[in-house]
């Protein structure tokens, strides 16, 4: 999974990225200190892996991973070349979802590019830049499709879609709110890889004082929550400065620090939950002495396709899957005991893999 972190200059975007990835990306109180995208990979915390590692006396534990891309700060007119221009747009097209850091804190020492704190205005600024960029992409496609449509029925059908989509974007609407039931049109939309079609998670960056109550008394946070609900986005509240402090601590110190702040989980854990929920992701597990590993798949994935995450041969030559749920295995204590109780199942090609399934795939190529 690849997430792009975006936001206006000086909203705490790079500070948050630093704390999430401990990559030490330069962060300073002036616009565009992140000129090239910084990339960091973080592991997804999953207590089940450690438990299985002990049970199987495993030599290696490999958690799922998320790749974060810190993309240079935006200003109005970025799609037309203002600020850093289109540099950020190419980088963001490759991500699975966008994490939009929104400033919901007051601090006279940190300037805001528009001179005041207004989360919804900031969201609109970035949305418009993404829309303008998508319109440019669409207009280039339309110019090609027009020529083809004169002698090609499918091209004519695609041109009709492109014109409807263009009108939709010109009303300052995001591509993800454009609805079509037609399978051809759905395939074309996916091919366009439009920025405004990507899922969005808002990171409401607050001061330490607003962290313990999850921003309930912060008007900016509440405004972002209402907006996100309307737009079918996820929101989590974070204090980037606190996250940066947390990133310097070991696990025991981190737990004590969070407890002192009245928090149950870190911002990273909130973000991972939000991204898994928004993208409809789950993890299945493989376990044995050589390695215990988590594999990330979409909800609804069938066994052969889940096997393909490990290797294409597993999917191509899939025979069956030997499955036991994590909870059943824990209740029984050992794989052998779970097998005795009939809790280890043999599943075929139509089996839909569940979160926490521990699977051994049988295949032949």
Which residues does each PLM region occupy?
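Conserved G1/Walker A P-loop phosphate-binding module
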Residues: 1-111, 139-140
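C-terminal-of-GTPase-core extension/linker across diverse P-loop GTPases
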Residues: 2-6, 17, 144-352, 359, ...
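Flexible interhelical turns and helix-capping residues at alpha-helix boundaries
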Residues: 9, 131-134, 193
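Phosphate-binding glycine-rich loops and adjacent basic patches that engage nucleotide phosphates
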Residues: 12-17, 45-57, 85-109, 121-130, ...
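Short, intrinsically disordered, mixed-charge
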Residues: 22, 54, 90, 128, ...
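Glycine-rich, flexible loop/turn motifs
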Residues: 23-31, 38-40, 48-51, 80, ...
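Amphipathic alpha-helical transducer elements in NTP-driven molecular machines
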Residues: 32, 46-49, 62-68, 82-96, ...
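Conserved Switch II/interswitch segment of TRAFAC-class P-loop GTPases
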Residues: 40-45, 72-82, 93-155, 168-182, ...
